[in-house]
Amino acid sequence: MLYSGDANLTDEQIAKLPFDLYRQGYEYYWKTHAHPNSTFKYTTSSLLDLMRFDATDHIALVNKPLLMIAGSKADSLYMSEDAFAKATGTTDKELVRIEGATHIETYWVPQYVQAAMDKLTGFYRRTL
């Protein structure tokens, strides 16, 4: 079995990563919130499958209420906007941008988590 992905970066190398998503993601998943049994490695075949996967391939088939949440400063915001535009199977849809949040910060920064939870609570009350 062939594995990929064990970067084992120093703090200096992490600080030099060019995008918040990678820098904060490495800190979050590798340092502050890593599971003790996680190796941070993927089987190479799984990584290749993940790289080929496109979550928007069939998003037009979604015909139920859709709520998408993204940070306004997220490096990945363009992906959410693209997916939202392609979600043509429903008119009951909303893309919420959490002001000031990056992608990873929406996981743990209290005011960003609260903003997401408030939106989700209202959405689920209305749609479930």
PLM regions: where:
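Conserved alpha/beta-hydrolase "acid-adjacent" motif
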Residues: M51, A70-D82
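Structural motif corresponding to alpha-helix initiation and N-cap regions
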Residues: R52-T56, L77, P110
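Alpha/beta-hydrolase
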Residues: M1-D57, K64
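Short beta-strand/loop motif that positions the catalytic acidic residue
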Residues: V62, M68-A70
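Active-site phosphate/pyrophosphate- and oxyanion-stabilizing loops and adjacent acidic/basic residues
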Residues: T56, E81-A85
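Short, conserved loop/helix-junction motifs that constitute active-site signature segments
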Residues: I59-N63, K86-T90
